A protein has these predicted regions:
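C-terminal beta-strand-loop-alpha-helix "lid" module of Rossmann-like NAD(P)-dependent dehydrogenases
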Residues: 1-292
Length: 292
């Protein structure tokens, strides 16, 4: 097979790959917009729920043994991490950075509750801290999935299986960068649930809690927590799509550069082949004339 034909086949192969990377970029862009829109649709509700909790907390009597606030076993806490990875790869170092961050902060006796197939597969046969029966998808976060995860987390804390639960996920810092972060889910910290200064549109007067503050708090605290989890899942999903867009954009640009270089090489090879053919034709014609 001629050199020019091989070059042409390579160019066509890279062009096909470039179509795939460009399509993946567009798909991730669409998913990113939808995820952000979904979160914007529900975030006012969870913001209002947080405001409501902050108005209830000051009325709670001190009850250090309550599972939502009690910091048990401070010397050697039974700690779990809710780890939000992706279901798919081809997103640059998105999953690797998150798992590296997790290993740097986790202790040998901690437990990993992993969301996303990439993280689950990476830890399944390599890390005994993975809770294998805990399996959830990271694709297209939903309120129901966040609610189910919240119920599991609260049950494990109430039953005494765990003392602390943290969420580990990737947070978008700006349009170009994102980094892994860790936030505590349970026990709740009263310092971060204090009421903000009242604005002009805020309700005035004392809050009446029926039948009592603890009963009201226990009803709305799980909603607040599943809002935290849904927000982290959505933020993580958006960071994944952003990372994949960056990776696919870089791959598409690299493919363009390769095609340009190969096209130049193909043109030189083709030009040399044509020149050689012309030379052979001229030489053959001269030989015929000499014979005649």
């Amino acid at each position: 097979m001629s050199s020019s034909k091989l070059l042409k086949e390579r160019i066509e192969s890279i062009q096909d790959t470039m179509k795939i990377t460009n399509a993946m970029y567009l798909i991730s862009s669409s998913k990113l917009r939808k995820a952000r829109q979904n979160y914007q649709n529900v975030s006012p509700y969870f913001n209002r729920m947080r405001d409501t909790i902050s108005r209830v907390v000051p009325h709670l009597p001190e009850e250090p043994e309550h599972p939502f606030f009690h910091e048990r076993n401070l010397e050697n806490p039974r700690r779990a991490y809710l780890v939000l990875t992706a279901d798919k790869g081809m997103a640059g170092a998105y999953n690797q950075n998150l798992l590296k961050f997790l290993r740097e902060h986790a202790d040998p006796n901690d437990r990993f509750y992993v969301i996303g197939q990439v993280g689950y597969r990476a830890l399944r046969h390599r890390d005994p801290r993975l809770v294998e029966e805990f399996r959830y998808s990271a694709t297209a976060p939903t309120l129901q999935r966040a609610r189910d995860i919240t119920v599991d987390a609260i049950d494990d804390c109430k039953s005494g299986k765990l003392d602390e639960i943290y969420i580990v996920y990737t947070k978008i810092q700006n349009a170009l960068t994102s980094e892994p972060v860790m936030e505590r889910l349970l026990p709740l910290d009263r310092r971060f649930l204090q009421p903000a200064p009242k604005g002009l549109g805020d309700p005035k007067g004392e809050v009446e809690l029926v039948p009592d503050a603890w009963t009201v708090f226990e009803q709305i605290a799980p909603i607040y927590m599943h809002g935290m989890i849904f927000g982290a899942m959505t933020e993580s999903f958006c960071a994944e799509q952003s990372a994949r867009m960056t990776a696919m954009d870089s791959a598409t640009k690299s493919a363009n550069d390769m095609i340009r270089d190969l096209q130049l090489e193909y043109n030189r090879t083709r030009q040399g082949s044509i020149t050689q053919e012309i030379t052979e034709i001229i030489g053959g014609a001269a030989a015929v004339q000499d014979r005649s």
